[in-house]
Design a protein with these regions (language model features):
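Exposed alpha-helical structural elements
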Residues: 42, 142, 232, 236, ...
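C-terminal engagement/docking regions of AAA+ P-loop ATPases
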Residues: 304-364
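Surface-exposed polar/charged interaction patches
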Residues: 27, 243, 272, 345, ...
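Conserved AAA+ ATPase small/helical "lid" subdomain
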Residues: 234, 241-311
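Non-catalytic, well-ordered alpha-helical scaffold segments
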Residues: 67, 141, 163, 167, ...
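A general alpha-helix detector
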Residues: 218, 236, 298-301, 319
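AAA+ P-loop NTPase catalytic core and its hallmark functional loops
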Residues: 2-248, 253
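Short acidic/histidine-centered micro-motifs embedded in hydrophobic/aromatic stretches
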Residues: 172, 265, 318-322
């Protein structure tokens, strides 16, 4: 995997994987939709990986989902990615925008503070007072910039925006036009070919500001589910923890048995069923793969910088509390039950599980 050297904490995908994108562009002989930097096949290779071209896999899970998303973005409807928190909706959105437009930074972060100007345009008020309405005083939104350049705009957490803000999306997606009456009669921006919108919404938050039927019709909905394959999830966690640890001046990896503890704990508590079929009480907290990465990373940092020894299941147990004890006091009871039954039984056969069980009991 080629990663651009930079001291920034987080690079956008088009910079982080700049070398991979360059290789894909160089060898891309397939037909491209108007305005696309890569062909649909090359976009797929960028996201799902291509060993022959030394392109790393970046999205783990439902490969046909990626194909459907690419097809949607070639059409006239927007793409709406919905799912539980931590299922890589934003990651998939960023990767699609980086591959298709070469720019994943045209983003509006949905919240109660978003107003219609964030989707259309605003003004530099000093220039507005000095010169009156002019192109120099106008501040384009990320969506307007995407329309002008024929690029992908991203809207995160759309359902957190107020209904009147969501309604502004209807004309943008149907007419692909933004009127600018302040600049004169008939002044407008029409979207260049290649423009489209990727929005995301959490299933747990859909009731915050429910989308209207008219807006829903402008989007093609795709559900991003948690990773079904345990081996895929384990590979993803190991890879992302490795990328994070590359920021530190030390070489450290989670031992295989400790990584297995992380994956099993999260899958058991997420699904409500252990690997042997035993029923497990599910906490209300989101036991997502993203949280599993955070726990694994925290365990490795704890072992490397505080304990000064090899990571064990005990380090995992200490980091797990911050994930489970978030939304409901009853989640503590559910975790105790899991530790007293599932973890205890596994601890008789595994040192990593024994260490996890002991540390979890000590912290109780």
């Amino acid at each position: 995997m080629d990663v651009t050297a930079d001291t920034s904490q987080k690079l956008p995908a088009e910079l982080r994987y700049e070398a991979e994108l360059a290789r894909l562009r160089e060898g891309d002989q397939d037909p491209k939709p108007a305005g696309w930097a890569l062909s649909p096949r090359a976009v797929r290779r960028f996201i799902l990986g291509d060993k022959a071209l030394q392109v790393s896999r970046k999205f783990y899970g439902d490969d046909p989902l990626v194909d459907r998303c690419i097809v949607v973005l070639m059409g006239h409807q927007g793409l709406m990615l919905v799912g539980e928190p931590g299922t890589a909706k934003s990651l998939l959105s960023e990767l699609l925008a980086a591959a298709i437009s070469g720019n994943s930074r045209l983003v509006v972060q949905g919240s109660a503070g978003v107003i219609e100007d964030h989707l259309r345009y605003g003004w530099n008020y000093a220039l507005l007072l000095a010169e009156g309405p002019s192109e120099r005083a106008l501040i384009p939104s990320p969506v307007l910039t995407a329309m002008q350049g024929g690029q992908i705009a991203r809207i995160e957490e759309l359902t957190r925006c107020a209904p009147e803000v969501q309604d502004a999306m209807i004309s943008l997606l149907s007419e692909k036009t933004v009127a600018m009456p302040e600049l004169g009669a008939g002044r407008e921006v029409r979207a260049e070919r290649g423009f489209n919108v990727i929005a995301t919404a959490n299933l747990r938050d859909l009731g915050v500001n429910e989308m209207s039927s008219a807006l829903k019709r402008r989007f093609n909905f795709e559900t991003v589910a948690p990773i079904a394959d345990a081996a895929f999830e384990k590979e993803l966690i190991a890879r992302q923890v490795g990328e994070r640890m590359a920021e530190y001046d030390l070489k450290a990896d989670l031992p295989e048995d400790v990584l297995d503890v992380v994956v099993s704990v999260f899958r058991d508590l997420r699904t409500g069923r252990a690997e042997d079929g035993a029923v497990v009480a599910q906490p209300k907290s989101v036991m997502s793969t993203a949280e599993a990465v955070n726990v694994a990373h925290g365990a490795l940092l704890d072992a490397s910088y505080l304990s000064g020894d090899a990571p064990t299941g005990a380090h995992v147990a200490r980091q797990l509390r911050g994930v489970v004890f978030k939304d409901d006091a009853d989640d503590a009871r559910k975790l105790r039950a899991y530790v007293d039954t599932i973890a205890r039984a596994r601890g008789r056969k595994s040192r990593a599980w024994a260490a996890f069980h002991k540390a979890a009991k000590d912290d109780d």
